[in-house]
Amino acid sequence: MPEPRKITFASLDAAILEAEQLLGSGYEKAGNWNFGQVCGHLENWLSYPMDGFPKVDSPADSAADPEAAEAGKAMLQDILDNGFPLGVPTNPDTIPAEDSVSDQAALSRLREVVQRFSAYEGEIADSPFFGVMDKQAVLSLQLRHFAHHLGFLIPK
């Protein structure tokens, strides 16, 4: 299995362009998820700051615990500086079943949530991991998240 790519994105539009290129060229997996699963997972996590987060097992409840809030801020800064670490499990409910949606449909849904986020002017829901975030912080985190997961798909 190939190693994941180390990529970065300056915008969500650039990430969508990368996804479109992967869909067009084909890809090799450097991890466990296929294209549709990656797109679906990214769609889910980009929608949560707008629609509210699901209940997750978090080592930190930043709303109730000041120490957890500080730990969440430190973890966020580390991700923004260095990217997402490999091997950290995610909520399995945020990963679509392997063949639950076509690659084209998954990309279309991801594109729609990117457009919705870009135009969004409402309140940002508090993150169960990082606490209160503004839209710019969410965008910065999501750019790292998109790079992390799209990096596991290697263009052919």
Task: Give the residues covered by each predicted segment.
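Extreme N-terminal tail/first-helix region
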Residues: 1-20
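Short, charged, low-complexity loops and linkers
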Residues: 1-4, 25, 92-98
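Generic, ordered loop/turn and secondary-structure boundary motif
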Residues: 8, 34, 85, 96, ...
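Amphipathic alpha-helix face/heptad-repeat signature
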Residues: 8-11, 106, 142
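Short, contiguous alpha-helical
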Residues: 24-80, 116, 120-156
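Acidic/histidine-rich alpha-helical segments that form the ligand environment
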Residues: 74-125
